[in-house]
Design a protein with these regions (language model features):
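Active-site-adjacent loops and short helices of periplasmic peptidoglycan-processing enzymes
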Residues: 20-198, 205-210
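Hydrophobic membrane-insertion alpha-helices, especially the h-region
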Residues: 2-16
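Short, intrinsically disordered, charge-balanced linker/junction segments flanking boundaries
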Residues: 1, 208-213
């Protein structure tokens, strides 16, 4: 549920607002929106199964000032528009998507962890945790993703050994073919947490495909 909320908000905003593209799912809608057209070499049966993207305002080209971006369809992996999408850059709190993924796939969500002073010393106050507070690991995913809590990220990573957890984050990236992605901490405070726009899209697509009901 958390993954669905996070991914849905991000991609709906990116496609319909920032870039100005709209998605249509079949040839009937395509003709209705753009007028009757013939696409050479493509059967009507194939067209009915495809998605199309078009600028809602043909006179206004996308104006995205970001240094790097990748907008794609997480259902089929197709690119809609991109700019420097293979450029490696610091990813800050987007790191928490991998933190949540590794935590959900490798840790017992019902185990209890204790909030330590080291966790509370992490930069940022989101989460409103108290010293020696006992909290279920699964419950830490909510402040981690919805509040971008650095304390929650550290609490999760420290539960079974911080270095081991970060190692699992990097191993997961490697297993997904994210060759330009690396993590030095679970929160994204380190500028050495880096990736590319395209590889973050791949990670998001993986999360969508493997999210739990």
């Amino acid at each position: 549920v958390i993954f669905s909320i996070t991914i849905g908000i991000f991609f709906a905003f990116a496609i319909t607002k920032t870039v100005g593209y709209e998605k249509i799912k079949n040839n009937t809608e395509y003709n209705k929106n753009l007028g009757a057209q013939t696409i050479q070499g493509t059967s009507m049966e194939d067209l009915a199964l495809q998605n199309f993207y078009f600028l809602k305002n043909q006179d206004k080209k996308p104006n995205v000032k970001a240094e790097s971006y990748f907008v794609g369809d997480v259902e089929n992996g197709k690119m809609i528009i991109e700019k420097n999408s293979n450029k490696k850059l610091p990813i800050a709190s987007v790191s928490k998507l991998m933190t949540a993924t590794v935590a959900e796939e490798n840790l017992n969500q019902d185990e209890i962890t204790i909030i330590t002073q080291k966790v509370l010393n992490t930069y940022g106050q989101n989460g409103d945790f108290k010293l020696n507070e006992k909290i279920r690991l699964g419950d830490l995913l909510y402040p981690l993703l919805l509040e971008s809590s650095n304390d929650a990220a550290e609490a999760i990573a420290s539960h079974g050994g911080r270095n081991s957890f970060i190692g699992m984050m990097n191993e997961k990236a490697k297993s997904l073919g994210l060759v330009m992605t690396n993590f030095e901490d679970p929160s994204g405070l380190s500028i050495n947490n880096q990736s590319t726009a395209f590889e973050l899209f791949k990670l998001t697509k993986y999360i969508k495909e493997h999210r739990k009901d």
